Each structure stands twice: as structure tokens, then as C-alpha cells.
Amino acid sequence: MGAQFSKTAAKGEAAAEKPGEAVAASPSKANGQENGHVKVNGDASPAAAEAGKEEVQANGSAPAEETGKEEAASSEPASEKEAAEAESTEPASPAEGEASPKTEEGATPSSSSETPKKKKKRFSFKKSFKLSGFSFKKNKKEAGEGAESEGGAAAAAEGGKEEAAAAAPEAAGGEEGKAAAEEASAAAAGSREAAKEEAGDSQEAKSDEAAPEKATGEEAPAAEEQQQQQQQEKAAEEAGAAATSEAGSGEQEAAPAEEPAAARQEAPSESSPEGPAEPAE
């Protein structure tokens, strides 16, 4: 931003200088020169030519002056830029200065860190120290605790080894048990199949036995029906025989009755020639 302001200021100065230059150059233009060309107003005399040359030289020196002024103006912005850069470098230098103290501080903490280590060594648990009048010796306790922890770790390691050793036979036994269980299950399955086959055979035998029983049971009612029919036929025959016997007995009774009547009729007929017929009783 500082550089931009310096550039704008330099442009303003250059603009302010250029109008002055234009004013300075305007008299030469009023003498008949425009844009570096000489205007001749009809004077072809050598004196006029010499005057024109002088004017040309004077006007020619004016661009040199202008170029010098422009160079001075450009040098001023350059100087301003350099000043701005110097200002920017000056804040950078304090930053560097700040960084350098930081680095120095970073270097100094190493020494300070060394001093706390020394303090820690002073207050380390390895050495006995007094706190409010009581002395605590951590060496023996730490040694005892370390020995106990080492003993516990060793015991744990031994226990782990024993457990691993016991787990290996258990695993082997478990595998053997699994194999035995599989064999037992296979044997049980075989026994179940055999029992099923035996049950099927027994069921077939029972069905075979039940079939003749059913046949005999069916034949028995048929025989009973036949016997009943025979009994009915016999009863009918007996009834018919009884009826015939009764009819025969009636005929026999009627026949003896007719015989006396016939005998009686014959008797009168026989006696009629001999005498009068006796009245019938």
C-alpha cells in the first residue's frame, strides 16, 4: 500500500512538472515551431534561417531539459520505492529481532530444562527425603514392590505356562471326547435304525396276524348267519310238518267217523229186505 501511494504521489508530481514544461515550451512554439517543425513565414533570408536554427537549437535543448526532469521524476519514485522497501525491511528486521530472542529463549530453555532435571534428581524417590519432619525411604519400599511385582509376573508367567500345558491335554482330551461322542452318536443312530427296522418287522408281523383274525372274525358272522338261516328253515319245516300232522290227524278222525256212519247205513240196507228199516237213531 505504501508503494502504491508513493507511485500516485510521483505521478502527481510528474503531472505538476509537465504543465510547467509545457508553459516553458510554449514560447518556442509561439515563435513558429510546432512539434519540432520550423514554420517559415515567407522569410527566406539567411538571417531568418539562422534565427530559425537558433530557435531550433533552443527548442532542441528544451527536450533535453524535459528528459532530465523526467529522469529526476522517475528517480524520485524510485527513491520513494526504495524508502518503502526500507520501511518494509525495517519491520522485518524487528521480526527477525523477535525471532532471534525466541531462538535465544528456545536455546535457554534447554539450560532451564536441565535445571528442573537437577531439581527432580533432588526430589527423586530413590533418595530419602523429609516431608514435614517425617523421613520416607522409598528405596526399600520400591525394591520390595519391584521384587513383588517381578515375583508376581514370574508367577503369572508360570501360571500361564501351566494353564497352557493343562489346556493342551484338555484340548486333546476334548478332541478325543468329541471323537468318542461322534462314535457314540453314530452307534446310537445305528441302534435307532435297527430299532426302527425291528419295530417295522414287528408291525408287519402284527398286521399279518391281524389280517387272519379279521378274516376269521368276518367268517364267524357269516357262519352265524348261515346257522340262523338253517334254524329258521328247520323251524319252518317243523311248523309245516306239524301242520301236516295235524291235518293228517283230522283226516284220520274224520275217517273213523265216516266208517260208523257207513256201517250204519249198510246195516239198514242189509236188513231192509228182511224187514222194515229201523229208524235211525
Swiss-Prot record:
Family note: Belongs to the MARCKS family.
Residue intervals passing through the bilayer: none
A GO-annotated cellular component: cytoplasm
Region annotation (Disordered) ranges: 1-281
Protein topology in the membrane: Lipid-anchor
Keywords: Actin-binding, Calmodulin-binding, Cytoplasm, Cytoskeleton, Lipoprotein, Membrane, Myristate
Protein name as annotated: Myristoylated alanine-rich C-kinase substrate
Free-text function comment from the UniProt entry: MARCKS is the most prominent cellular substrate for protein kinase C. This protein binds calmodulin, actin, and synapsin. MARCKS is a filamentous (F) actin cross-linking protein.
Composition-biased stretches (Basic residues): 117-129
UniProt xrefs under Pfam families: MARCKS
InterPro entries in alphabetical order: MARCKS
Residues with a covalently attached lipid (N-myristoyl glycine): G2
GO molecular function, one term: calmodulin binding
Species: Gallus gallus
Biased composition regions of type Low complexity, renumbered to the chain: 89-98, 182-192, 218-281
Location of region: Calmodulin-binding (PSD): 117-141
GO term, biological process aspect, one: central nervous system development
Compartments it resides in: Cytoplasm, Cytoskeleton; Membrane
Amino acid composition bias (Basic and acidic residues), ranges on this chain: 66-84, 193-217
